[in-house]
Amino acid sequence: MRWEELEDALEVLETEREYDGYFCSIKDAVIIVILGSLCDLQSVKKIHAWATTAHVKTFLSETFGIKRIPCYWWLLSLLALVTPESLNQCMKQWVASLVPQLAAKLEKEEEEQSKKKNKKQPLTIAIDGKEIRSTGKMKKYDSPLHIVSAHIGELGLTLAQKTVESKSNEIPAVPKLIKALEISGCMVVTDALNCQRETAKAIVEAQADYLLSAKGNQKELMNDIEQYVQDEKLRATMDSVSRTEKGHGRIESRSAYTSGDVGWHPGGREWPALKCIGAVHTRFETSKGVTDEWHYYISSKVLTAEETASPCKNGMVGRIDALAFGCAL
């Protein structure tokens, strides 16, 4: 990995007020936090302990010229000076520079598998919102803030993130986030909250495809798909795949169904480029009993049951690293 690209991206960092860089620059502090986050360290305290180990100090010195590691409280103070918007822009720029390299590597690794399928699989972009719990106690906010993120499932990278002041504000924020990204040719997956016509429209206009989860907030849509899927004769005509997994004291059975037969649906004209409906049935068997769940989906692409099952099972929802961002708040 070329670390120069990270340093270049951080050149546009902005701060709430001026700082002379005495002892440790803000850029160095952010680099330490980013690298610690990549090592799956989930608090600034753990990152500081990691950064002060001998081999990490040597790496930081030789790679980035960071000669001094600030104490834990000083590291927090430096991060608090960073504006969230500029940090988000820096991360978007850095991740964008990495995507072509990682995508090429992924394509090479899956070359044999792709040959068998005779088609190239698109990258999956997951749109998801997470609550920043610590912000609920801050006087300037009536409720905890939320981060809406766009995550590349196959590469384990977050493309971009946007803060909103409540969960309901995620809905108008998602189309804006999508319009700011280059996602042409990708498959965009969202949770039920963001199964919205405006979101679907933004995805299609970005020349991408969507796979949206239909639940209670789109009750009529969910009920229509449910009636179709639960009709045994109609379900028998759908493409399907089933698998069973055992482990951790439970048996999980999963079945996926898809159909390109959407002409009957009255909302076909309302949902942009609607071409497919799908369902995933999950059954869990444990010592405590048996539970089962049905989840319903719509897509702008005619998908096989296998294609539907994969992103739905894995969720494709990546962890947003909010350490530096949360401190900046």
PLM feature spans:
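Domain-level cores of phosphate- or acyl-group-handling catalytic modules
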Residues: 165, 171, 175-216
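An anionic, glycine-rich sequence signature occurring as long contiguous blocks
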Residues: 215-315
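Electropositive, glycine- and tryptophan-enriched low-complexity nucleic-acid-binding patches
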Residues: 140-186
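Short, flexible loop/turn motifs enriched in small residues
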Residues: 138-146, 290-291, 318
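Short acidic (Asp/Glu) and glycine-rich catalytic loops that position anionic groups and cofactors
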Residues: 11, 55-56, 205, 289-294, ...
